[in-house]
Amino acid sequence: METEASNESIEKSLPKRIALLIQYNGSGFCGWQRQKEGNSVQSILEEAVSSLDPFQPIKVVAAGRTDSGVHASGQVAHFDCSGFIPANRWAAALNGRLPKAIRVRYSALRPITWHACFSATYRRYRYTIYNGCKPNLFLSPWCWHRYQFRLDENLMNLALQGIKGFHDFTAFQRAGSNRPNALTTVEDVHLFRQGDLVSIDIQATGFLYGMVRLLVGQLVAVGEHRISVAEFERRWKLKLREEVREAAPPNGLSLIRVGYETMIFPENIAFDSFPFFSLSTSDPPPSPQ
């Protein structure tokens, strides 16, 4: 009996690992990662968790470190705590202390060896472009407005399909990266138009610093007939970073899903709200000449 009681006491004293599925509007944040100056998603979450649990120190670790202004509808993170609060109640408890720009949709108990970042098998990002000819105040926080021409999504998709596979993406890596190389595997790409919105999904085992925004900037140049598909391929295959100058703005980008060998949250939860607007195709921009 004493041994059982002792084992139970030890079990209760061990830290518990809690996984979170998080959404945030990145507009008002300096990115996910805690910074010396600026409001980060990580710092706000850590303050909220610390206020609810005595386990110290609290560090919230994310699957993807999104940049300043980038959103997330399917970010996954974890932290260790005392277990005082049941795992499935953490979402509601945190939402009561977080600003409206951050919402925790689910919380779950995971083994202490599970890691939000290192256990992930892929990340999926979506970039959304508003291609209507008139400004739209309510879409501007979530989309890049390209109104000059109607984007040629067929050419963009042709260029996009070519990046699938294991490649060196030096052309799409911003300065300041601490990675030893620019090698990664793009597993899936998908470009689709819904009315005046053009969405670009990219799924990879890992992403380089600034990769999606630089890539989208080049795809838009293809879609506006400023460069050819062949020129797009030449730039990235020859690692011509100096010729990849225009990066898409951060507000159109969202981390929409993180994959694991065993999915711990409902698989489609990240797709149920953002960004899937239903727009008409009235008054399209003129086609590029």
Swiss-Prot record:
One of its GO terms (molecular function) is tRNA pseudouridine(38-40) synthase activity. Keywords: Isomerase, tRNA processing. It is an enzyme of class 5 (isomerase). It comes from the Bacteria. Its EC number is 5.4.99.12. It catalyses: uridine(38/39/40) in tRNA = pseudouridine(38/39/40) in tRNA. The active site is at residue 67. One of its GO terms (biological process) is tRNA pseudouridine synthesis. CDD domains: PseudoU_synth_EcTruA (cd02570). Substrate binds at residue 125. SUPFAM superfamilies: Pseudouridine synthase (SSF55120). Belongs to the tRNA pseudouridine synthase TruA family. Homodimer. Formation of pseudouridine at positions 38, 39 and 40 in the anticodon stem and loop of transfer RNAs. This is tRNA pseudouridine synthase A. It comes from Prochlorococcus marinus (strain MIT 9211). The lineage of its organism: Bacteria, Bacillati, Cyanobacteriota, Cyanophyceae, Synechococcales. The gene is truA.
